[in-house]
């Protein structure tokens, strides 16, 4: 067992639920695959699950039981879950009864979905991965939780995440992605082993899981799909690392109400799944038919007709599409003013994979514009170079050292986290960011401070009123570099439908522009870290994908492009769980 505080409770619960559903507590791989005859939940998409449910081949109870059995078999390897919903089977029974009575709520009716554990659920604890919140039962559901349940989804589990969405600890001891004080490290199903390198042998995974959302359970078919959140790449990164399709939508597409915040200026939720079709279905369920009065940003984009993103699943969408290839930084290393150290670029294996991706685009009839230049990535004026304006993220970026980074994340954390705590009322275990920091220090021996709390510290230094002007100035500069001199310049200047970037490298600019980005799996590359693994360690290859980024509210077009690319490539490989 590699789990941290409280984690083993989830496994025990899974075993009990699996046993009460008619399965033994430890099933063989073959038994955990079978629901009815040769039907399997492994790698099975939402449309296929719905077809099976509609035909009566399976019931929602059988689906939940099969997923619980799979969790019971493999969770100890992955540590992907913080809490399993103890009422999942009861919910499945109710939805089966509705279906039998002729009521089908939508394409997620009776489908098990997991939520990142910073998304509030009143009936399942919401920990954010922090010890202080390990028993938190919020007094209200997140808007997206309500929408999913109204659509018939079964919330089967709450997933591991990087603690507080990766806003607990940066330098000098950065928190490892998908580590929480509540549950420990999560592992990547493509190689669920610990990193054996000296200096890294502390329990962390040998293949990074990405973060702060978790893709491990979704990749391993623990559920049909999951919902993550993203402030600066937290959907794109784990999707890339776990061979998933992930969408970080335009800010405002999906309500953030009831999601533990970092900053409302960049936070969003989004779907993560094994196929583009599944993310399209989940995207429609997550977006409200009307703006959420609890989130003013939800007026930005207009939902498609009937919130149906599957209408854009067009296998021929690449024909005639204009796709830009931004070589500088994303493909080829660049130097920035005042620093001779190269930044960005790809290794040989990644370069070959991206060459294959570009060739596929051309073969599908896309008009590939190669290269295109993003002005803020090559600007020689330091004040206009995006790479020189990172967000303040570690102890070195305290008030005395934050002149050359954007304070937006740390300012937003002070403003929005305290407001979120206030919304919890009597359920809140602490009432302010200051109290949380004090609580962590008082419980350091229990594991609350394994990586420190430098990001909480620099956030708590901010004064919401006194630092408002600085935050607004930094936001304006960020918008200029990521939009006007960034994505807008390249997309509009070349009349592009999208740009294509490797792996998760395009996540940062898309997130800071609040523009949509979608990842698509595209194969495996050697896992060759620096420093290297010890002699004799047989590292397995790691996932690597591509990402399409477009203008604000361009999700329908990006989904179409991603679907066409996925259909033409078919490069997703299931993790070797069996």
Predicted segments — roles?
Residues 73, 220-334, 339, 343, ...:
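Structural helix-boundary/capping segments
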Residues 108-269, 294-300, 326-328, 332-333, ...:
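Short glycine/serine-rich loop/turn segments
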Residues 59-61, 77-78, 104, 109-111, ...:
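Loop/turn elements at helix/coil->beta-strand transitions in domains of secreted/extracellular proteins
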Residues 48-55, 133-136, 267-274, 548-550:
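Short, well-ordered beta-strand elements within core beta-sheets of diverse protein domains
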Residues 62-64, 93, 147-150, 308-314, ...:
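Acyltransferase
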Residues 56, 110, 150, 199, ...:
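Glycine-rich, small-residue loops and helix-cap segments
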Residues 2-3, 7-100, 330, 351-366, ...:
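An N-terminal boundary/leader segment
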Residues 109-131, 312, 317-339, 389-483, ...:
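Short helix-loop capping/hinge segments that flank enzyme active sites or metal/cofactor-binding pockets
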């Amino acid at each position: 067992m590699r789990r941290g505080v409280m984690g083993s409770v989830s496994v025990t619960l899974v075993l009990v639920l699996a046993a009460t559903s008619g399965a033994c507590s430890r099933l063989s791989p073959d038994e955990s695959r079978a629901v009815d005859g040769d039907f399997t939940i492994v790698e099975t998409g939402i449309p296929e699950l719905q077809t099976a449910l509609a035909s009566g081949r399976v019931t929602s109870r059988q689906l939940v039981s099969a997923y619980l059995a799979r969790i019971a078999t493999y969770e100890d390897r992955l540590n992907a879950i913080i809490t399993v919903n103890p009422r999942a089977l009861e919910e499945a029974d109710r939805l089966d009864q509705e279906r039998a009575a002729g009521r089908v709520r939508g394409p997620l009716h009776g489908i098990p979905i997991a939520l990142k554990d910073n998304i509030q659920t009143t009936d399942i604890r919401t920990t954010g991965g922090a010890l202080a919140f390990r028993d938190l039962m919020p007094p209200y559901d997140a808007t997206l939780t309500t929408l999913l349940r109204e659509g018939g989804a079964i919330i089967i589990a709450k997933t591991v995440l990087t603690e507080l969405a990766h806003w607990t600890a940066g330098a000098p001891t950065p928190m490892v992605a998908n580590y929480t004080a509540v549950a420990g490290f999560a592992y990547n199903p493509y190689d669920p082993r610990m990193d054996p390198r000296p200096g890294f042998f502390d329990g962390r995974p040998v293949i990074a899981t990405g973060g702060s959302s978790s893709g491990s359970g979704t990749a391993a078919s623990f559920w049909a799909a999951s919902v993550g959140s993203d402030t600066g790449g937290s959907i794109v990164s784990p999707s890339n690392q776990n061979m998933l399709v992930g969408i970080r939508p335009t800010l405002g597409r999906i309500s953030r109400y009831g999601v533990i915040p970092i900053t409302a200026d960049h936070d969003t939720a989004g779907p993560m799944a094994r196929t583009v079709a599944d993310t399209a279905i989940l995207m429609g369920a997550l977006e409200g038919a009307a703006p959420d009065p609890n989130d003013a940003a939800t007026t930005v984009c207009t939902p498609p007709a009937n919130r149906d993103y599957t209408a854009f699943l067009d296998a021929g969408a690449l024909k005639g599409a204009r796709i830009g290839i931004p070589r500088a930084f994303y493909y080829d290393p660049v130097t920035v003013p005042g620093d001779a150290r190269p930044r960005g670029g790809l290794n040989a294996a990644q370069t070959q994979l991206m060459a294959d991706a570009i060739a596929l685009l051309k073969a599908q009839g896309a008009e590939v514009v190669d290269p295109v230049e993003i002005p803020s990535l090559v600007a020689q004026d330091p004040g206009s170079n995006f790479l020189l304006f990172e967000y303040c993220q570690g102890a070195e970026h305290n008030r005395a050292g934050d002149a050359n980074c954007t304070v937006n994340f740390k300012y937003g954390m002070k403003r929005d986290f305290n407001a979120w705590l206030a919304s919890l009322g009597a359920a809140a275990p602490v009432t302010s960011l200051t109290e949380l920091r004090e609580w962590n220090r008082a419980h350091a021996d229990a594991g609350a401070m394994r990586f420190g709390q430098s990001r909480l510290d620099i956030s708590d230094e901010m004064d919401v009123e006194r630092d408002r002007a600085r935050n607004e100035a930094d936001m304006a500069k960020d918008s200029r570099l990521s939009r006007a001199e960034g994505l807008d310049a390249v997309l509009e200047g070349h009349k592009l439908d999208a740009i294509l970037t490797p792996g998760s490298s395009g996540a940062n600019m898309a997130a800071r522009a609040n523009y949509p980005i979608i990842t698509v799996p595209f194969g495996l590359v050697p896992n060759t870290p620096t420093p290297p693994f010890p002699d004799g360690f047989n590292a397995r290859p790691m996932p690597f994908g591509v990402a399409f980024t477009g203008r604000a509210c361009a999700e329908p077009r990006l989904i179409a492009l991603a679907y066409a690319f996925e259909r033409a490539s078919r490069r997703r490989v299931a993790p070797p769980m069996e």
